[in-house]
Amino acid sequence: MKKKNIYNWTMLLAMALLMMAAGTACDQNKNNKQASEPTVEQTEMTEVDMEALAKVMPKYSSASGFSEGLAAVCDKETELYGFIDKKGNEVIPCQYYYISTDFNEGIAVVYKSSEEWSLIDKKGQEIASFDNQFRPGFNDGFHDGMMAILNFDDDKEGYIDKTGNVVIPAELDMKMCNGPISTNFSDGLRRWYDYSSQKSIFIDKTGKKIFECEGEAEDFSEGLAAVRKCFTLDNDDFECRIGFVDKTGSEVIPFTFTHAGHFVDGLCWAETENTCGFINREGKFELTGDYKTLVLDEGIECGNYPLCPTFSEGLAWVCNKDGKFGYIDKTGKVVIPFRYESHYDEDSELFVTIPCYDFHGGLARICDKATEKYGFIDREGNEVFPCQFESAEDMSEGLAIVERDGQYGFIDAKGNCTFDMSK
């Protein structure tokens, strides 16, 4: 999928790879909010002024979606970054070299230059500043009060707290394949994979090891984590299966699945050789159909990425055996017909693009196979916005950032847009 956003990930990855060369799968925490920070509900109810946004957006060359009431923007003239609110006010001036993450838990990560980055609060006040001794992790900032930091000289990562103090030294091996380099704490635990022992290790926020298990684990969700184990067969070949462990590392769902996602509202996408659908916490299939797992062709040597659906706002997209996508509800009823198609490589049996996405704020993104442009549908499958945007993100706090003809703007669930839709 071709997608642009405000963050200069290409630049960041390039610097990462250069530094490394020089040196060598398929929750928001509400308890760590500072008392002065608005709740998620208060932030989402912030009044939006679409007319004001329409007036200011032409001055920016790119923008992100809103997070905690603010959106990152890049000034066309200076090519520097700052933040606007939902009324179009530039509350944090465009003065940064670039922005690494949106606001999360009241903090954003910004670069003052290519050699110096900082944590700032929502008033633009600097909390802590860092040089290139280590870099911010490739994730979306703070979770559970912690954020990953990367040391490319030693290929290690650690964690800082919201004051900028190093809580866990950068001594954990960075995970380079089959997932992001750095992961967030989830359910109070963080995972990392030891390639030498082929075991997954879970640590708490002090860096203490809680347990380890054989195989490559995913993050915990609703108290369970998927783990992928590979077994040697009689012919010296091997096969891999996925099961689930609890927070003690005990197996609670047997290793019988070829693909599996993570639990949301007590359901998890899973697939065996004969069955595909959603399982419950006992590992039993509750919703099944003539489905298959979406496996994306990532074009990387270390493998391809299975994208497992989850329920969001009561609906989940699924792919049928014919390669068409639609949406089902939690009874298994098809609510939006199987009419969305993806580019599919028959030789590799891999999908190249994603035609539809989860629902957020009452709308879901869709992507037209022919034009590779994005639009939005409502929960009945009606097109609120036809596929006309070169890039688009999910609805967030009542708005979604979209790109049309090289210009960024916002849309809402009522069909309003900061663009002149008559052109």
Describe each model-derived feature in a short phrase.
Residues 2-12:
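Bacterial N-terminal signal peptides that target proteins for export
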Residues 21-25:
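C-terminal motif of bacterial Sec signal peptides marking the signal peptidase cleavage site
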Residues 15-19:
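Hydrophobic core
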Residues 37, 41-423:
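Residue-level detector of conserved, function-critical positions
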Residues 1-3, 26-49:
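Intrinsically disordered, low-complexity repeat and linker tracts
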